[in-house]
Amino acid sequence: MNENFEMRDFGTYSPEEIIAENLQELFERADVLGEEEIAHLCELAAEIAQGDDLADLLSSLPYYRISEMKPLAGALADHRELLSRSRKLLEARQCMILCRALYEKLKHRENLLSALFPDVEEVLPQAAGRIVYQRSSYANDAYLAFASLLPNARATYAHSFAAACEEVYNGHCEYCILPVENAVEGELIGFAKLIAQFDLKIIAVCDIAGADASRSTRFALLQRNMLPLSDADAMKNGCFRFSLPKESASLVADVLTAANFYGLEFRSANTLPPSEQSLFNLTFDICGGDLYPFLLYLATVAPQYTPIGIYSHIKQKGI
């Protein structure tokens, strides 16, 4: 018996109190094991982080899977399902700790975000600064708000929202503007479908108020690349949005748990209509949270996820 645990006279205890005391002793032992576990995971993170090529390092992150459980005898066999679930929770926790420790080793590396999102599309000189959108009074106000963020912003007009997306997709314009939400309908699924169809990334959003303040519309500024306009602004007043394919539905609960572990606040979730590619779109508030470890976690356990945007929420000019 561990000499650090004092002997107790259980003769005066009720059965419930004895069980509670035994559980408390197990918790204390678990704390010691937990410290050892974290130390080992930090050592593993240090080993992983030794690679020189950051992109190769991130692409080879280990995906920890539960090993096959050995046959259980006696009473334990009756709890196989419960033990299996408990082990999966332990596996998830270890992965979250590992990614947090790995970020501590990598955070001083240059271009960490670029390594996490390596598929950067080159912007042609004639497209740089061009913002395309379908004209309306609301969209004009959104353009003025977004143009204040961009040097040499120039407006270009499209005959439809799909045409605006296509201009960016084909490299003719650097940015486009789409309405993505309003106070009446909530999220506008038709525009979420356009964003997915053309693989565009949200880099800023702005709420445009109408004559009736209750009828505001949220517009998004989008581009082909995932990198935000400003890391600092996005971290202070930003969101992270991504999608998981239908076949990854079982991962949603794990992802929500990890987001909470890293201090990200859940904002919304939706799915595209069944007739389209089935996707779970998830949005988190990243202010005050640890986004980078969460990105490492997603790269490890859900490499099939699709980033939709790391973006800041800007105010309409004059409001």
Predicted regions and their residues:
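Domain-level signature for soluble enzymes in the chorismate/prephenate branch of the shikimate pathway
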Residues: 2-319
